[in-house]
Amino acid sequence: LWWGGMGNYVDYTKESVRNDWKQYLKDNLLSYGVTSVWNDNCEYEGLVDKDARVSFEGKGATIGQVKPVMSNLMCQLTQEAVHEEFPNTRAFAVCRSGHAGIQRYAQTWAGDNLTCWESLKYNIATILGMGLSGVANHGCDIGGFYGTAPEEELFVRWVQNGIFQPRFSIHSTNIDNTVTEPWMYSGTKHLIRDAIQFRYRLS
């Protein structure tokens, strides 16, 4: 059960499923001109039965054995589908999860982080570590994804740090019914604006 209703994980190690997934993308997104796809909830966490069987190209395996490749396959298929529909287009995919090799197919981020100073500190180390591991196109949810609205100084410092990350995204689902936005604090929005403008000057 997902927050939107019933759902299932897909076995990307089965050829017919891979073909179905690409066709699903083509019919429901790419046919409308979409060339950027955000693959989310693809880390195959929360599975009750780690011994559930998957095809693994007809050889058979458990999801526990092949879980690491699933998000990579999802993003690879996304890239393939976009290139099949738009041969001369540079596809852009975002993926919440990925393992060795994900940098070939998608941009990733440090997961749904908390709105706190500890999370900001953790994200810096995570992003640097991912870069050293070959995943250079990485970032985090600026200001935190989950929790209450970030306090003013935390938000300013997070933006000032975030402008140097490859992925810059202010993205939240605050539990206090607020939305984290660049202009949320009138006293410091000029600092946010200056930081974002500086990022654009760097590109």
Regions found by a protein language model. Name each.
Residues 1-203:
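Catalytic-domain carbohydrate-binding cleft regions of carbohydrate-active enzymes
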